[in-house]
Amino acid sequence: MFLQFFIWGAWYTTIGNYMSAHGMSSQAYLPYTVNPIAAIVAPFFLGLIADRYFATQRVLGVLHLFGGVLMLLVPGATGSPGLFVFLILLYNLCYMPTLGLANSLAFHNISDQEKQFPLIRVYGTIGWIVAGLFIGFVLSRFSAGQLPDTTPLPLYTTGVASLLLGLYSFALPHTPPPGAGRPVSIRSIVGIDALRELGSKSFYVFIVSSLLICIPLAAYYAYAPIFARVGVYDVGTSNVVTSVFPNPSSLMTLGQISETGFMLLMPLMFVRLGVKKMLLVGMGAWVLRYALFAMAAPSAVFWLIVAGILLHGVCYDFFFVTGQIYVDKKSTPAVRGQAQGFLVLVTYGIGMLIGGIIAGKVYNGFKGAATDLTLAQWAKFWPLPAAFAGVVMVLFAIFFRPQTQERPTQASAPTPS
């Protein structure tokens, strides 16, 4: 699990700055659209092929080996944006199914899922954090004075780590295909059966709100690392925090550190607030985060930028994890897996795809022919996702009426951030 998310964290927070530094700033949003495309395709691969015919650890190994080779080819395509993004797409088509496979393998080989899996899953978040710190403290020694985020080193790191994990996967405990011999349909893979069973006004409001709130979220994943570079490192900010987090990707790990801390507070907050207020707090934190970025931009106010990154723990835990708990409580055992898969499809698939495209178009509209937005332009960029998230929050507050205030069970997020 550590390597599973180390791999993702090594490239996901650096690819935008790398593309901006190599004449591809106008295409920097595209990796954040091909990733959701792969998230949409992954359930079909898992449901129709991987879960029915092959041992989980073998599929995991093969996909990581293919993905590692593809990622090692990516830097060589730097001069050709189309080929560069196409290779990123192929890589993601290999990687995204491994998220479900890794969870499936873990669940099959533990006896108490509620107690043991969260302890395993937390190593994924740690792996993401270590990836950012590795880039900041290790790769910086080999980047010839440049920010390592702008060099191909993180991409090579991802490729090598993928190959290592691919080889290691074959040594994992044998895990037979969980769906062998069972009928499967497109309806069950997409989650239509679960949607019909869970259908209620409050559930539909939750699903639509989840999709809509992921549209402004895409701006954070795609452009917060670039904003951190422009607003912190390009202006030469030097303090105790930048000495500990010396590059954008390491600074962004503050969000995952915050996520881990707020995860510990969730049971207490859930008892006090219930589902609706927890979800509203998460949405409100997104509005506040983008507002802080907008206020920080004109004068590159470091602590406002850091505060916005630290809010990621509230943004992610209070909305996504709470949402998973809500879906879990609404579901029967027969459709629970379908329901969670449908939530991932709607959020990390459709929502993030739409959001990535919109964020890229807006960013390029501000940027024009320049390489980066100016600080003044960033101050105009961030209020847009803030306003969008604010509208979704207000509509959710008005129309979401849960029948009961469900209490939490253990839940695990499909992604670290």
Q: What are the roles of these predicted feature ranges?
A:
Residues M1-A39, F203-S209, I213-V240, V244-L251, ...:
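Helix-loop boundary and gating motifs at the non-cytosolic
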Residues F2, L70-M71, P81-L101, L105, ...:
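Hydrophobic core of transmembrane alpha-helices in multi-pass small-molecule transporters
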Residues L30-A50, S250-M266:
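Central cavity-lining transmembrane alpha-helices of secondary-active solute carriers
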Residues D51-L65, V271-M283:
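Cytoplasmic membrane-interface "Motif A"-like loop-to-helix N-cap segments
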Residues L65-G79, G284-P298:
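C-terminal ends and interior cores of transmembrane alpha-helices
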Residues V74-T78, A161-H174, F381-S417:
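Multi-pass alpha-helical transporter architecture, strongest
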Residues F137-V160, K361-A389:
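A membrane-interface helix-boundary motif in multi-pass transporters
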Residues L172-V208, Y233-V240:
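Juxtamembrane intracellular "pre-TM" segments in multi-pass secondary transporters
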